[in-house]
Curated annotation (Swiss-Prot):
The gene is PHS. Gene3D superfamilies: Jelly Rolls (2.60.120.10). This is Phaseolin. It comes from Phaseolus lunatus. Major seed storage protein. The keyword Glycoprotein applies. Residues 35-193, 228-383 form the Cupin type-1 domain.
Amino acid sequence: RRVPLLLLGILFLASLSASFAISLREHNESQDNPFYFSSDNSWQTLFKNQYGHIRVLQRFDQRSERLQNLEDYRLVEFMSKPETLLLPQQADAEFLLVVRSGSALLALVKPGGTIIYSLKQQDTLKIPAGTIFFLINPENNEDLRIIKLAMTVNNPQIQDFFLSSTEAQQSYLYGFSKHILDASFNSPIEKINRLLFAEEGRQEGVIVNIGSDLIQELSRHAKSSSRKSLDHNSLDISNEWGNLTDIVYNSLDVLLTYVEIKEGGLFVPHYNSKAIVILVVEEGVAKVELVGPKREKESLELETYRADVSEGDVFVIPAAFPFAIKAISNVNFTSFGINANNNYRIFLTGKGGPTGKEDNIISAGINPDVLGLMFPGSGEDVQKLFNNQNLSHFVNGSYHKNAHPHEQEQQKQQKGRKGAFVY
């Protein structure tokens, strides 16, 4: 089973050539690119007022049959103005949240008591399903932006349950009969209606403005422990062209990754052995190239999916599909890897040498004699080519030397060949 995967990776390398368009079918950021979600038309606004908004990305499984394995996952964006509160709620989903910018006070109301976390940019936290929580932007001059991966418990939709009624949202308590309510609260229904459900005094929405005194009171009880951060103190990969930080949430089977690429840098061709990656652009502009097989009528061919991505865009990368990212400007993004346990990043190019973390898998793992059987060049020359890069993972994305005419002719001859086996 490894051979088709390896061949797919090798063929991806050819896609970076000058005559790329000749040998592979391409999809740009248009309607027929199932992996690209534009920030302009892929987000649905659930709530919006002068204090902030809540948006959810289009369902992955409704976008393409290729994304059916993501039917239980949704991406949620939250933004709030300074000194605001997202009213207490719970949901039939687990959340893994990342603070994109600003700071937050996040309160989790549990049977054993309430825990308030102080979160800064790039901090992450898991909210268990059914946990009542509320969220505060304590700053007086900076917006709070959060991205959440939601993992549903009751398929297929996710439902937020708010304790209180607003002009935009009804309290779920209101759904109970008066006999249930008066017995549960040990109070007459008139009092319950006046205190909980009266229209007078209702908030306009689920994001409201609050005073500095309440913020100071909650801040005194907040703690920063038991949360994880994607900050620079925990870098896993770093060089002059970029850096990467990973956090694995084993209980959720999710890999959370933060990547920064310098302008002109290239995140070299690689793939994830098992994880399906949901990439969310935080800042900057980049080009994404993804190569995968597609069945079209009775023929098989490789297809290239390209997109120029910027802030708010989302790109999904299926497991084992090779891809590369080139930074047009300084760019950073967060990604959620689904099926993360026992996942490996397989780099197809990069620094060669003895087997180790810095190596690409081709030069480190394939015998030169085998390389000679795989490619037109000699095994020794092919191995030297794969070892020619002096950096790993992040490299200079520009190479200006023109291809030799004979090399261009060889590239043209690749037209019409089939891609990976699909079965």
